[in-house]
Amino acid sequence: MPDLIGLDFETYSDVDLKKHGLYRYTESPFFRPLLVGLATPAASSWYFDISQHSKQLAREYIGDAIHDSTIVAHNVPFERRVLAWLDLHYPAKRFIDSAVVARAVGAASKLEAAAPQLLGVDKMDEGTKLIRMFSVPGKHQEANGNNAFDSEITTLNRREWDQFGQYCALDAKLGLNIVLQYISWLTPAEQDYSAITLRMNETGWCVDVPLVEEMQRRYLENQEVALQEFRFRYAEPDLNLNSLKQMKEWCAARGVKANSFSKERVEKLIAALDKKFEDKTITAQQWDNYKAVWDLLHTKQILGGSSLKKLKVILNIATLDSEEPETHRLRDQYVHIGAGQTWRTTGRSVQMQNLKRLRSEVDDMDELVDDPESEWDNSKLADNLRQVFTATDPNGRLLVGDFSSVESRGLAYLAGEQWKL
């Protein structure tokens, strides 16, 4: 095994990491690393206070500490982004992600859960409190009138600052120990796949942000129109379509029993009502009642639009490409061995693997942007959501593929049934 070094950063940014993603977080002008924790198999862990030193000194210190070691971090993409901010660039193969290792052996992904499961050691309980104190804007930024990190907070809270450093160093040590004890679970090939996923996430996917903005505008407009039309037609200005209780009572009053309004249940209810409309024995009043419920369910579908909720997520996290200023990219979208039981790569954020498959005949997206009078309902928008992703080259093509019956072929491979493959 090559020489290993555990690495962990504690950082500051005014951007919400969960909402806006790793790249928006680190591209904020107020982003900065605060502490680095380091650990080696032969020595105890330690931390270095980056906040008190220049970027150049921090780069030299960390670069010298890493030297030619393989870097272990829990959730490598984050540490790689911070290293890149410090102008420290290492090949993806120089990293081992202890979170991937933890998931591979069936443990939790987060270090606070994986460490006690795999090592019998807990993270420091004070971590969340310390992150809130030092890593996000607070009263110091409010007093200063800007969101820049204020080093005075470290002077006024020396004990907590030292605790934060110990917390950072412990995380570096815990991640390293997970790898030392369990890396044998990952074959060299699987480690290569992990590096490929990392590079894929960093390269990202080109996305047409102006098109996303237009689709988002129409999506919200369609929602508002549908809701207002329903309220006007049935004189229901106060009916809350997000209230399960009110929805159940409204449907029950019209002869339709409904216990859930999930996407699947709404589809089944609409199908059941379509059959009732074919029943020649129902009265005119029943027909009107069923039609009212049908309209309510259809409105609920328009308001739900789970696929189109991805539009806002894309707008929240897409960033400009530094090498192609006119191009936006979506990055950090996949988690290697995200599903520990099956070792499947899973999605995060936009969940690109769940994008609706394009029909054989796609719609012209130029019409959407160039003709504001064209009508695109939310179903049509959802059918074409995949088209917001584009080829890198303006004259290129984006090839979209899918494995046919991949699960059955996996089982066939394990069973030696070559005919299925």
What are these regions (language model features)?
Residues 79-85, 110-117, 177, 246:
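Alpha-helical scaffold elements adjacent to nucleotide-binding pockets in ATP/GTP-utilizing enzyme cores
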Residues 1-10, 15-17, 28-30, 35-40, ...:
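Conserved "right-hand" nucleotidyltransferase catalytic core of DNA-directed polymerases
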Residues 65-71, 237, 395-399:
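Short active-site oxyanion
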Residues 1-109, 360-373, 377, 412-414, ...:
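Conserved RNase H-like, two-metal-ion catalytic cores of nucleic-acid enzymes
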Residues 73-75, 243, 401:
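Short His-Asn-centered micro-motif
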Residues 124:
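Conserved nucleotide-sugar phosphate-binding/catalytic loop shared by glycosyltransferases and other
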